[in-house]
Amino acid sequence: MYSLVRPILFRFDAEKAHHFTLNSLRTAEKLGLLPKVDSHTRPTELMGLQLPNPVGLAAGLDKNGECIDAFAALGFGFVEIGTVTPKPQPGNPQPRLFRVPEHQGIINRMGFNNHGIDAMIRNIENSRFKGILGINIGKNAVTPIENAADDYLICLEKAYAHASYITVNISSPNTKNLRALQGGDELSALLEALKNKQAQLAAAHGKYVPLAVKIAPDLDEAQIDDIAHVVKSVEMDGIIATNTTIDKSSLGSHPLASEQGGLSGLPVREKSNQVLKLLAERIDSKLPIIGVGGIMSGADAAEKIRLGASAVQVYSGLIYRGPELIKECLAALK
C-alpha cells in the first residue's frame, strides 16, 4: 500500500508531506481505520523496562507527541517523541528538510522546532497509549551553551511523570554548539546534574525513570572512549547511537551534498554502526545501547543487534519503506 502512496508524497515538499502524513495518521487512528498490529512479538528488557518488542520509533518524527496512538498502532515496541525544549521555538528557516532518494537519505536542519514541553505534556495526557514512551529533551536555541543544563533540567522535571524513559539529546548538528556538550568535562557536568535531579524526582514521584543520552556518529575513538567513561562513571541508564551525520561525502556530487544539516538514512548506516561497535566494546554490557541510523531493512536491524544494541529505532527507513519496515525488522529479530 505504502509503495503506491510514496510516489505521490515524494512529489511534495518534504516538510509539507511530513505534516500531511502525520495529520493523516492521526485522523485514521481516531476513526479506527488503522489496523491494529500485534506488538507483543519479542519481549525485551531495556533499561529495566519491559518492551513488547525491540523495534522503536526514533525521535524527530513526532516532535510534539501529536501522533502517539497512531504510531503505537503500527506495531512499535516503544515510541520516542521530541526533541522538545522548555519554550516553544520555530526552528530554522525553511526549506530545512530534503529527501535524497538516489541515496535513500534525508537531510534536515530543522533546529528543534517544537511547541514546548507544556504543549507536549498536554498531548501525552490526551493520548490513550499505555506502552513504553520515551521523551527526547533538548535546549532552546536562545539559551547560551553554558546554561544548557538549565533547559535540560526544566524538561526533565516536567517530563518525568509522563515518560517511561527520557533521552538527553546533545548530538543534533542543527543547534549551535550543542555537540560541544559531548566533550568530557561538559558531558560529565551535564549528566551529573541530570542524574542528581533524577534521584530527587524518583523520590518525589515514587518511580524511577531511566535516563539515556543520544550521541553523534561523527566521533573519533578518543571521543568514544571519553563518552564511554563518563556514562559509566555517572551511571547513565542507556545510550542511543546515533544521531544524524554532518559528513555528506557519501553523496558525492549530488546537488544536495552542499546543504547544511544532518544526513540520515542509508548514508549514515556505516558510520553509525562503527560508533555502535566501538561503544559496545567499551561499555562491555554495563548499560544498554539503542541502535539507530540507517536501518532500511530487517537485515540492518539484525546487524545493529549483532554489533551490541539491545534495541533499535527507525525513522528515515520508515519514510522510504513505510510500515512494512517495522514488520520486516520484527521478523528479522525473532
Where in this protein do the model-derived segments appear?
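Glycine-rich phosphate-binding active-site loops on the catalytic face of alpha/beta enzymes
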Residues: G75-Q89, I170-S172, G238-I246, G294-I295, ...
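Short beta-strand/loop segments at the ligand-binding rim of alpha/beta enzyme cores
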Residues: L49-G56, K130-I135, Q200-L219, E281-G291
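Catalytic cores of alpha/beta
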Residues: N64-A73, L219-S233, E281-S285, I295-V312
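C-terminal helical cap(s) of enzyme catalytic domains, especially alpha/beta-barrels
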Residues: P88-Q104, S249-G261, G317-K334
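A gly/proline- and charged-residue-enriched helix-loop-helix capping module
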Residues: G82, P86-I132
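Conserved, mostly hydrophobic/aromatic
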Residues: D13, L57, V79, M120, ...
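Glycine/Thr-rich beta-alpha phosphate-binding loop at enzyme active sites
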Residues: L22, R26-E29, L33-V37, P173-E186, ...
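Active-site glycine- and acidic-residue-rich loops that bind
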Residues: N140-L153, E186, A212-K232
